[in-house]
């Protein structure tokens, strides 16, 4: 994991962080980590399958007949594990 050093942090900010950490029942360091994580990470990462499903829905989706056709064309054989020998 990476380490970050914050220099010249005003005393008022450090005090506010300590108070906020105490309110949440964690250390100041854990509070700062939580603030950074919630600020820079999206609340929920969009997964590829969900994104593709929403695009298909916006485009009008598939009829039951089209979905069944794709289901019949799909390769249903189980994947073989890779051999490194």
Curated annotation (Swiss-Prot):
Pfam families membership: FitA-like_RHH
Feature: compositional bias, Basic and acidic residues: 66-78
Gene3D superfamilies in UniProt: Met repressor-like
Species name: Sinorhizobium fredii (strain NBRC 101917 / NGR234)
GO BP annotations, alphabetical order: regulation of DNA-templated transcription
UniProt keyword Acetylation, yes or no: no
UniProt cross-references to InterPro entries, sorted A to Z: Arc_rbn_hlx_hlx, FitA-like_RHH, Ribbon_hlx_hlx
Function (record text): Involved in plasmid stability.
SS bond list: none
This protein's name: Putative plasmid stability protein y4jJ
Region Disordered, annotated ranges: 66-85
Similarity comment: To P.syringae pv tomato plasmid stability protein StbC.
UniProt keywords, alphabetically: Plasmid
């Amino acid at each position: 994991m990476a380490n970050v050093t914050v220099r010249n942090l005003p005393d008022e900010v450090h005090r506010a962080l300590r108070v906020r950490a105490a309110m949440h029942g964690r250390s100041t360091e854990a509070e700062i980590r939580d603030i950074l994580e919630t600020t820079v990470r999206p609340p929920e990462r969009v997964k590829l399958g969900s994104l593709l499903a929403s695009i298909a829905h916006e485009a009008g989706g598939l009829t039951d007949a089209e979905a069944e056709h794709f289901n019949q064309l799909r390769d249903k054989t189980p994947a073989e594990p890779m051999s490194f020998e």
